[in-house]
């Protein structure tokens, strides 16, 4: 199935049903009073995370989702039926953004998580709600309010513990094939990897982590060059980044300059991403003697001003790969996801009409105090009749 990690959709919640103006009329009960019922609330639109999905391709074709309108109220104090909700299922890891305001409405990070993205309109009030001691035949009612309408941007961001980055042909796909059951395409030309892939690295029966492979970065990636800019966002949720460096590039390029390009593109894209823990991993050491590889790796690290630990591996022959994976596993165990980050609240999104009923009833009460006989006229059989005799 084609990997699609962005989609724009329109969500429209249902309008609220209108209130009803009605008076009870039955045999022997000519003046039964108001009995108009309220309308029904409009249906809501929800997002739900589903671990069985892994792409947003469905929303390239179906772009509009509308909840059902609430039914109008009826006589005999009958309340209108509430509109049916609409639930949109998205892959775990989807971020929901309101395109109109730029607000992030929420991150769908757990299976079964639900997020309200469009709230249905409030029901209108029937005339029964407006009766009082001074207004026994109210002809007021309120209409239902419109439901929320939003243009949403869905961004799928892979959930992985470890992210891999590097220049094209650095050996990222070969590495993920060596440590997991994932089988991304491997070839001797740049940009063999066109879409991100995930692999589960199982260290033993109880310990494992997920590694993400994205297309290689090139200079100018943060401005849109190559494929990297589309997929850098998939590294935002990783806990550690493995920066693979081809220790002996076949094209004769300088490994130091290649590494600086990657670092520069990370900083241009996001300071938060650039600040993540990043490990240097020198790949393809099987192409030279061990001592030569160690000397070259040391020289590159010094040129980059690298003071931390670095690794020498050969993904093709799996030399040094096991030790690297165990160190990654230890780091993940010792650095669990921060509770504050896990419980991070989305930006508060205001929904329309939250105080609608309270405001409407307050206005009616004010009007009743100022002019309590507004609803009476000469043809009103329910009104009070005054006869003056001189």
Swiss-Prot record:
Residues 1-159 form the Obg domain. GO terms for cellular component: cytoplasm. Its EC number is 3.6.5.-. Pfam families: GTP1_OBG (PF01018), MMR_HSR1 (PF01926). Residues 129-145 have a biased composition (Polar residues). Residues 127-147 are annotated as: Disordered. It is found in: Cytoplasm. Its cofactor is Mg(2+). The keyword Hydrolase applies. InterPro entries: G_OBG (IPR031167), GTP-bd (IPR006073), GTP-bd_Obg/CgtA (IPR014100), GTP1-OBG_CS (IPR006074), GTP1_OBG_dom (IPR006169), GTP1_OBG_dom_sf (IPR036726), OBG_GTPase (IPR045086), P-loop_NTPase (IPR027417). GO terms for biological process: ribosome biogenesis. It is an enzyme of class 3 (hydrolase). Keywords: Cytoplasm, GTP-binding, Hydrolase, Magnesium, Metal-binding, Nucleotide-binding. Monomer. NCBIfam families: Obg_CgtA, PRK12297.1, PRK12299.1. An essential GTPase which binds GTP, GDP and possibly (p)ppGpp with moderate affinity, with high nucleotide exchange rates and a fairly low GTP hydrolysis rate. Plays a role in control of the cell cycle, stress response, ribosome biogenesis and in those bacteria that undergo differentiation, in morphogenesis control. Belongs to the TRAFAC class OBG-HflX-like GTPase superfamily. OBG GTPase family. This is GTPase Obg. It comes from Salmonella typhi. The gene is obg.
């Amino acid at each position: 199935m084609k990997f699609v990690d962005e989609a724009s959709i329109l969500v429209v919640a249902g309008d609220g049903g209108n209130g009803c103006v009605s008076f009870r009329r039955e045999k022997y009960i000519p003046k039964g009073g108001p009995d108009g019922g309220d309308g029904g609330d409009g249906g809501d639109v929800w997002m739900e995370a589903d671990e069985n999905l892994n792409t947003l391709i469905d929303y390239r074709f179906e772009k509009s989702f509308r909840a059902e309108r609430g039914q109008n109220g009826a006589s005999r104090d009958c309340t209108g039926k509430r509109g049916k909700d609409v639930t949109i299922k998205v892959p775990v890891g989807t971020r929901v953004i309101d395109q109109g305001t730029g607000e992030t409405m929420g991150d769908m990070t757990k299976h079964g998580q639900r997020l309200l993205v469009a709230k249905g309109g409030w029901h209108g009030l029937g005339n029964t709600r407006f009766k009082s001691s001074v207004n026994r035949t109210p002809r007021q009612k309120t209409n239902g309010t419109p439901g929320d309408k939003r243009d949403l941007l869905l961004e799928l961001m892979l959930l992985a513990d470890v992210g891999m980055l590097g220049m094209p042909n650095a050996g990222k796909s070969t590495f993920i094939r060596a440590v997991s059951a994932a089988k991304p395409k491997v070839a001797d030309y740049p940009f063999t990897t066109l879409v991100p892939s995930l692999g589960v690295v199982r260290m033993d029966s109880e310990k494992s982590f997920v590694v993400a492979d994205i297309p290689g970065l090139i200079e100018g990636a943060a401005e849109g060059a190559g494929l990297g800019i589309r997929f850098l966002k998939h590294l935002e949720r990783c806990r550690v980044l493995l920066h693979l460096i081809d220790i002996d590039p076949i094209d004769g390029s300088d490994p130091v300059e290649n590494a600086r390009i990657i670092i520069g593109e990370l900083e241009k894209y996001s300071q938060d991403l650039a600040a993540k823990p990043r490990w240097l991993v020198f790949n393809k050491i099987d192409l030279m003697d061990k001592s030569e590889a160690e000397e070259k790796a040391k020289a590159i690290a010094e040129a980059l001003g690298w003071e931390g630990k670095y690794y020498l591996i050969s993904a093709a022959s799996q030399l040094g790969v096991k030790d690297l994976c165990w160190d990654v596993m230890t780091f993940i165990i010792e650095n669990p996801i921060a509770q504050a980050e896990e419980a991070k609240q989305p930006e508060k999104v205001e929904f329309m009409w939250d105080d609608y009923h309270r405001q409407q009833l307050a206005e009616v009460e004010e009007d009743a105090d100022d002019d309590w006989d507004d609803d009476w006229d000469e043809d009103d059989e329910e009104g009070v009749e005054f006869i003056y005799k001189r």
